[in-house]
Regions:
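Short hydrophobic/aromatic beta-strand micro-patches
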Residues: 16-18, 54, 79-83, 125
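Vicinal oxygen chelate
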Residues: 1-8, 14-17, 38-41, 49, ...
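A short local loop/turn or secondary-structure capping micro-motif enriched for an aromatic residue
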Residues: 47, 69-73, 130-132
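Core segments of cupin and vicinal oxygen chelate
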Residues: 9-10, 16-59
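Short amphipathic alpha-helices within nucleic acid-binding modules
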Residues: 28, 86-91
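Short, charged/polar surface micro-motifs in flexible loops or helix N-caps
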Residues: 56-60, 69-72, 85-87
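Short, charged/polar, Gly/Pro-enriched secondary-structure boundary elements
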Residues: 57-62, 118-122
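Eukaryotic phosphotyrosine signaling hubs
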Residues: 12-14, 73-78
């Protein structure tokens, strides 16, 4: 097979986040984080539903996948972006979200991490919209 005919991966579409209570997670990601629900369908093979959401205008989605008790609450390594990390940090803190300190280190954009209701760790970095 030559390089010209070789198949390759050309993008990222969806990343999964394991959650114990899909209804609670759906409410958190929609109401607290402002994500849009794109799909919510039962999937017997997964033992729950396929719930797909995204930040407004994003081509990449998250799937809130039903998880066993011992699977949810992981460091997802997922990084979201915002135009204003300090404002979002304050807003999430005021909403009662478990948020760590806002990091303001020389040479890197402001960032912080937080946990969803299942304890999954997620990250936010300040990146102006025109750079995303």
């Amino acid at each position: 097979m030559t390089d010209q005919t070789r198949a390759h991966i050309n993008g990222v579409r969806t990343v999964g986040i394991p959650v114990r209570d899909q209804d609670r997670a759906l409410e958190f990601y929609a109401e607290t984080l402002g994500f849009e629900k794109l799909m919510d369908a039962p999937v017997e093979q997964l033992g729950g539903r396929w719930i797909e959401m995204s930040p407004p205008g994003s081509a990449i989605t998250i799937a809130l996948t039903h998880a066993r008790e011992d699977v949810a609450g992981v460091d997802t390594r997922i990084r979201f972006t915002t135009d204003d990390a300090a404002a979002l940090h304050s807003q999430l803190s005021a909403s009662g979200v478990d948020v760590d300190e806002l990091l303001l280190w020389d040479g890197i954009p402001p960032m912080f991490d937080f946990r969803d209701p299942d304890g999954n760790v997620l990250y936010v970095s300040e990146v102006p919209s025109q750079q995303v």
